[in-house]
């Protein structure tokens, strides 16, 4: 029971680290820095990994992080789909930078498949196959003029 409590606490802390890192990396899009530098998906993932490396094993292996950046025109309904289907992380995921100064709404999502170790004795918080828990962070914003 003690190990389950510790694992749950670490999981919640890791979720907060991912939220903060995603918010800071998404700010690069909100303030035009990503657009001005032509930041591609790999560069965005690298920036995010540099911000969360204290808790996450994604530095040097960007496959552990999945990002989804979608741009919505003003007045358009924002539809976000559940990334988990039948215990697997599924897309479609995209990466599209908003035009600088556009009135569009941008939604940035970051996902990390966190491995779980205490999954027996009736305590199993996995929501992915392979005893993993999907950690997700979302930032939504309008690009600064």
Roles of regions detected by a PLM:
Residues 1-51:
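Alpha-helical assembly-interface signal, strongest on the long, hydrophobic N-terminal helix that forms
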Residues 37-76:
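Extracellular/periplasmic head regions of type IV pilus-like filament subunits
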Residues 61, 99-103:
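Extracellular/periplasmic catalytic domains that process cell-envelope and extracellular macromolecules
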Residues 73-90:
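Charged, often glycine-rich, active-site loop that binds/positions anionic groups
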Residues 80-85, 104-114:
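A short hydrophobic beta-strand element
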Residues 92-100, 123-128:
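Short, P/G- and charge-enriched loop/turn segments at secondary-structure junctions
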Residues 111-145:
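Low-complexity, S/T/G/P-rich flexible repeat/linker segments used as non-globular hinges
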């Amino acid at each position: 029971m003690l190990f389950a409590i510790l694992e749950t606490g670490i999981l919640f802390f890791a979720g907060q680290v991912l939220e903060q890192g995603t918010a800071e990396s998404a700010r690069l899009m909100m303030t035009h820095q990503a657009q001005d530098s032509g930041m591609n998906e790999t560069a965005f993932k690298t920036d995010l990994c540099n911000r969360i490396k204290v808790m996450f094993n994604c530095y040097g292996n960007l496959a552990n992080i999945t990002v989804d950046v979608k741009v919505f025109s003003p007045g358009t309904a924002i539809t976000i789909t559940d990334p988990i289907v039948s215990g697997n992380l599924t897309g479609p995921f995209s990466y599209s930078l908003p035009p600088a100064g556009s009135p569009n709404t941008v939604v940035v999502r970051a996902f990390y498949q966190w491995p779980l170790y205490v999954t027996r004795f009736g305590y199993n918080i996995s929501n992915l196959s392979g005893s993993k828990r999907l950690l997700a962070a979302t930032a939504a914003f309008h690009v600064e003029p």
